[in-house]
Amino acid sequence: MTPKLIVALDFDNQDNALQLVEKLDPNHCALKVGSELFTLLGPQFVKELVRREFKVFLDLKFHDIPNTVAKACHSAAELGVWMMNVHAIGGLKMLQAARESLKTYGKDKPLLIAVTVLTSFEEAELASVGISNTLPEQATHLAMLAREAGLDGVVSSAHEVKIIKQKCGENFITVTPGIRLPNNLKDDQSRVMTPQQAIREGSDFLVIGRPITQASNPHEVVSALLRDL
């Protein structure tokens, strides 16, 4: 069974990242590798996590012309990752090209999800880049585009999960960042929820970083979260 919890490995060096990984159990959580760590350590680090039997969410948010994104997704799949993402704002052709690039992997193909609206965004920031939709409208619009393109789901704030499920179906995966424990500050993310709130809203997978990575006992925090969920 795939764990509902995805731990974000937001580190700037390999030693700290691996120290945390050694305290975690692949049966209890998946791992997210983002741009910072991937740029620093490259594909070999991802392969090492896969070798340790962790499910890896490669969070590189590909956004380019369709052919380039298709090749990037195929390269990511070669690493053995469980999930990867692209920016939905890249458009229908780009999303379809990404999906097509993974067909050769058959039933073993990674999950392909699309980023809707970053959880750091607020209404004013959407307007500043020329988007007149509200945050829920934009997230839902992009989720429906991803669904039309045949993707498996989206990355979305928990605030938009319920409407996305209504529009795209219960089987359309929602991966939710911006998850904070009740005693944690918002940090640099604006639209946050606790794990329990996000699950009630219908989130399928929760991405949690600092509350786990900065904990004195990460394994204990993960265990407590799983009990609560």
Curated annotation (Swiss-Prot):
Catalytic reaction(s) noted: orotidine 5'-phosphate + H(+) = UMP + CO2
Organism superkingdom: Bacteria
Gene Ontology annotations of biological process type: 'de novo' pyrimidine nucleobase biosynthetic process; 'de novo' UMP biosynthetic process
PROSITE patterns linked to this entry: OMPDECASE
Residues involved in substrate binding: 10, 32, 59-68, 119, 180, 189, 209-210
Keyword Magnesium attributed: no
Keywords: Decarboxylase, Lyase, Pyrimidine biosynthesis
CC per GO annotation: cytosol
Active site: 61
Pathway: Pyrimidine metabolism; UMP biosynthesis via de novo pathway; UMP from orotate: step 2/2
EC id: 4.1.1.23
Any one GO molecular-function label of the UniProt entry: orotidine-5'-phosphate decarboxylase activity
Family membership noted in the UniProt record: Belongs to the OMP decarboxylase family. Type 1 subfamily.
HAMAP family noted in UniProt: OMPdecase_type1_B
Physiological role: Catalyzes the decarboxylation of orotidine 5'-monophosphate (OMP) to uridine 5'-monophosphate (UMP).
Protein name per the record: Orotidine 5'-phosphate decarboxylase
